[in-house]
Amino acid sequence: MGCPVSRGGSPGCGRRIAEELRLAEDARLRLALLGRCIVKGSPAQVRKELRAELKAIDAEWRPVIARESLRKELDAIDAEWQHAITFWHISRAIIGSIELSKELDAIDAEWRPVIVRESLRKELKAIDAEWRPAIRLESAYRAIIGSIELSKELKAIDAETQHAVELRRALRTIEGRIELSRELKAIDAEWAPRIAQAKEIAQARESLRKELNDIDAEWAPKIAQAKEIAQAKAELAAATDALKRAADKLQALGKMGTTSTPGTDLIGVVTTAVTTTLAGTQPAPGTDLVGVATPSTALGQPAPSTALTSVAAEVATPSTALGV
């Protein structure tokens, strides 16, 4: 049996049951205690105590008895109304199912296009998966045909515009050449004075080089002779020093004659050398070019005639030759 107040097995029902069990245990203990008292006391006193104890037990159990009677009544009412309650639950369930059906119908009506689209999409995907090889083949075939047609059209366009393209290329080439010619002419006009000046300088250098080569060829023997004369002059100076030292020794020893002096002997030797040298020389020619140095001047040496004259002047007197 369920709880008379809380009929669903709630925590309140458990507490009441525990309370009833506690009261029953107390009544049992009291009855046991009363039984022991009956054994020990007189019957009148025992009846009095028993009556008082029963009244106390009735007072304590009256609410429990009332609840028990109320529970029995409720159980009877539940039994009477069970069919009505069941019918009510069934009607509620039917009404709920009807409302749920209406809501589901509304949802179906709302989602029907989506469902249809989804089903169509699935069917189309299946069709695509089935026809994909054929579609690819057709696409490739169309691409090949399109490329062939496009190639033909491009070739036709190239054939039509070939002359125009060639003419445009030739025109661009001519324009480029004209622009290049203008630039080159401008460069030539800008650099013409410098080029002419450079040519004149090159010609002047060439003519000067030829003249210098001619002068070098003309003066080469004289330059060689001047070198020989310089070498002879050095040798003559060395010989003069040797003769001077020898004459000094002879004079110191008194071996020289009274009629001969170191100066006269040396004059004879030098005169012979100078006469021989002057016989083989010629007068220096005049300068043909104004401002052009002679080879001897370029070599840093005096002219041959000047060299011989200086040698003769140095040995002209005995005192000069002997260093007196």
Swiss-Prot record:
Subcellular location: Secreted
Residue runs in coiled coils: 195-255
Assigned keywords, A-Z: Coiled coil, Secreted, Signal
GO terms, biological process: biological process involved in interaction with host
GO cellular component entries: symbiont-containing vacuole
Keyword Nucleotide-binding: no
Leader sequence segment: 1-32
GO terms assigned for molecular function: actin filament binding
Main location: secreted
Role, per record: Associates with actin filament appendages that are formed in the inclusion appendages of the parasitophorous vacuole during infection of the host erythrocyte.
Entry protein name: Appendage-associated protein
Source organism (scientific name): Anaplasma marginale (strain Florida)
Gene that produces this protein: aaaP1
